[in-house]
């Protein structure tokens, strides 16, 4: 197994989530190398993805909402807008330096990365999206990157090892590379999807410190792909939190090249069935990638699923789940294995919901749902506290995975899921030492 020596020590827990093989889309090659961005002189820090199919690919992207958008975010967003998502064939990524808050030079460097990638891989102008991740405020070692891009040409391929090398090359404080792949069927045609992501800290909704890209050989219009990606991201990468910080760089990109054939999937009525089937496939895929980011949360010992049900709206349900997920008091209680449901209620109470009827205290219930299949443990039922068996609660909190169900009892029937982790001493250590 290829392991990035520049990332935190690969733990036994994390190794469970690194695949030993995969299925990969037709017409794409990927790779990763060390070019000299990272200080240790050997860790992979430059990755590329390229469409080798005989026709241009379509792309969609979702970017950070942070006001201090990094140079690669601005450059990539402009490229997507200029081309309406059509004719995007490559992604170039460096790790170890965010190229954020780097002024005009940062913009020039991001554009240069795209131009050199276009040239090396034989694409027409403006065919490449750029991503960077790492320390904010430092200029890129751009000469190292630009001389490294041509070296990628001989290191790309479509094997599992190539995909794993690509996933490793985008890591920073991650403990393991995040790679997911799967095959699926639409209208009798078999398609494949594969993707990588990075992120372990500075993760919260609306695109935080994470990068991710996934590709498929299904034929999808750029407009349909953008709508599907936005829907999927809202229910995956924008439904996770590690520490509540939103980064300057985060980007999720989807690319479809149509190499597996079949009818074009568009967003019109004649394609409705295939459109919604693809939306389901992309959403579940994005959720798997996003959940790997949470599992690798800096210093995390628990993976927590928050399920809010019977809300008046999806927006209310997600807002409440997000409020709990970003509560430091809740997260530290989970690390301490303390069934302090008062912290959950507190976070529910100050969440940003739409109306006064969105939360009715005497209809609200909170339950621990064990992931080992044993009996759930009610903590609060219709606003009334239960007599909690602390020994049973402690038993549940010993599990690595935990689900907490919040039933709002509004009669609205809407629900949302959100994924988070606990907050530990190690999180402080990792981030206190980040630049050293």
Swiss-Prot record:
One of its GO terms (biological process) is ornithine biosynthetic process. It catalyses: N(2)-acetyl-L-ornithine + L-glutamate = N-acetyl-L-glutamate + L-ornithine; L-glutamate + acetyl-CoA = N-acetyl-L-glutamate + CoA + H(+). InterPro entries: Arg_biosynth_ArgJ, ArgJ-like_dom_sf, ArgJ_beta_C. CDD domains: OAT (cd02152). The keyword Disulfide bond does not apply. Catalyzes two activities which are involved in the cyclic version of arginine biosynthesis: the synthesis of acetylglutamate from glutamate and acetyl-CoA, and of ornithine by transacetylation between acetylornithine and glutamate. GO terms for cellular component: mitochondrial matrix. This protein may be expected to contain an N-terminal transit peptide but none has been predicted. This is Arginine biosynthesis bifunctional protein ArgJ, mitochondrial. The record marks 133-134 as: Involved in the stabilization of negative charge on the oxyanion by the formation of the oxyanion hole. Keywords: Acyltransferase, Amino-acid biosynthesis, Arginine biosynthesis, Autocatalytic cleavage, Mitochondrion, Multifunctional enzyme, Transferase. Heterodimer of an alpha and a beta chain. SUPFAM superfamilies: DmpA/ArgJ-like.
